[in-house]
Amino acid sequence: MKITIVSGARPNFMKIAPLCRAIDAAREAGKNISYRIVYTGAQDDTTLDASLFSDLAMRKPDAYLGISGRDHSQVAAAIMLAFEQELNEHPARVVLVVDDMTATMSCAIVAKKRGLKVAHVIAGTRSFDMNMPREVNRTIVDAISDYLFTAGMVANRNLNQEGMIPEYIHYVGNILIDTIRYNRHRLVQPLWFSSLGLRKGGYLLLTLNRHDLLEKKAVLGSLMQTLAGKAGDMPIVAPVHPYVERAIKSLGLDMPRL
């Protein structure tokens, strides 16, 4: 069985890695199974640093579609055309997609229209806000998937309430835990920990990555002020992308502990 595994961004690889290792093990055990990793971005994507794939013990993507951009419709159209060509050149029986990105939806649609089986990892997640582009993506992908792999029972309930075929739903748990367990021996205190005046159990970790939140200054400002108030004297460590840093700084808030 040939499987095409799609990744639309760096975080997807954290969830793909355990699957790749499992398929490798099955193949070594004599199973007739293989996979091809397709990244919808560019080969020179700066977010895919050299250590990423070695850290995850997985091979680099077999193909790069080279699609990027901010306009959802243009990106979706470009990915669909490129992925169509990819499947023409490298046929598969199953297309496995992850999460709820535009790439996830685009590749799932292409696969379904070609009569292929679609597997969705992290299925059933819902915000119940259709103004969020990702909510649109995940709802569409779940509706056309043949294998719905969920991380929790709430996701199962969401899919059942939407009328999904029960036999399609598979509760497998949070696959990120597999990645954490695989790398737990490497989880050591970084050298900069003490230089920032941090102590174990005495700091908060913050990450922000939703564009729709970052673009709503009033909401973002309220969130940051609430966080600062609740944190008190506790330092807040925020490993964020540069555009997130700019969005926070543009608020002009006094947050010396951030």
State where each predicted segment sits:
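Residues at the starts of beta-strands that form the adenosine-phosphate
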Residues: K2, N32-R36, K117, Y168, ...
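Active-site and donor-binding regions of nucleotide-sugar-utilizing enzymes
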Residues: T4-S7, N12-D24, E28, L52, ...
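Structural beta-sheet core signal
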Residues: I5, I37-Y39, H120, Y171, ...
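Cofactor-binding loop segments of dinucleotide-utilizing enzymes, especially the Rossmann-like FAD-
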Residues: G8, Y39-A42, A123, N174, ...
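A short, Lys/Arg-enriched amphipathic alpha-helix followed by its capping loop at the start of a domain
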Residues: L19-I33, T226-D233
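Conserved nucleotide-sugar phosphate-binding/catalytic loop shared by glycosyltransferases and other
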Residues: K31-V75
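A nucleotide-sugar donor-handling region in carbohydrate enzymes
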Residues: A42-T47, G66, I144-K217
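Donor-nucleotide binding loops and adjacent catalytic segments primarily
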Residues: A50-L52, V188-L258
